[in-house]
Amino acid sequence: MFRFALLLSLCLSLSATARAALVPVDMDTAAHLYQDAAIREQVRAALGSMPAHIRKLFQGNTSTALTDKQLDAINQAAVRAFRIDVFEAPALHAFADHLDADTVKKAEAFLASDAGKRMVAADLGLASLSDADADKVMNGDIAAVSTPQRAVLFEKLERAERSSESTVHILLTMGTAVALGTAVGSSMDPGPVEERARKSGESSRQAMEENLREPMRRYMAYGYRDLSDADLKHVLTFLQSTAGRQYISAYLASLGAGFYAMGRRCGERLGESLRELAMAQLATETAQREPPHTTPPDPVKPYK
């Protein structure tokens, strides 16, 4: 289910009260489930397109065209920040913090089932799609053969997973992280920057969620086209269970923490680079405004 446009299609986390009642599992246990779900492979497949997405993010938020040096700085910051080693440590910690022993046991049983294995394989297949093909799928230009019964199942799956809500949540979280990191790297006060990014995101959240619902259903239908109706029902049953809801809550928390860390790292590196470029530009402009340095003429010697 990965591509940047829908890095996650899993539900938002449970309430703080429910999380407080959990007895988190250890890191080794979480890492085993993380491996079973092929999270690393799916995230790694999404990272290659991140520099282009970050460039678009900045190009869409400026009224003046970015210079080649600024675009290069954005690209370099994204390449260095959006890496699996930056993602994995915070992601695994968050994953472990949102899991308990019963959830792990039932999630492992589901992932070991035929339907669970086919779901993971389908997720990996979606992760290998190019951005161009992913866009075509979400726009309906590429579609899987469907039936009214399957359409109903995918509508239920999208609602059960709250895929639109979670995708928007990740996009806004990462955007805020990049903005905050850029402020820190530029030696600006991060508080107002973070608040503006948060308010901007909240004002558009509902519209973004509604606009994503149908594209997300198309994406799921295409990715799971080789799963039978029985498989889809098995997946839906797990997702609607208590353990399933907790598992996808942990999955979302994991991805949210990992992408926040990468976004923050990207912003900090970018802020430093943009500050250096601005200082160099200011020095150049100052030098151009100053009158050229001339050597004073030799004093006239008195005539003897």
Where do the model's predicted regions map?
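N-terminal Sec/ER secretory leader and immediately downstream segment
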Residues: A21-D131, C266, R289
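Extended amphipathic alpha-helical interaction segments
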Residues: A127-R225
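A cross-kingdom marker for long, charged
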Residues: R198, Q206-K304
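Outer-membrane beta-barrel domain signature
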Residues: A122, A127-D135, N139-I142, S146, ...
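Second-shell loop/turn segments in exported
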Residues: D36-V43, N75-F82, A91-F95, K106-A109, ...
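An acidic-aromatic pocket/loop used at catalytic or ligand-binding sites
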Residues: T29-R44, A132-V178, R269-K304
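Bacterial N-terminal signal peptides
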Residues: A5-S15
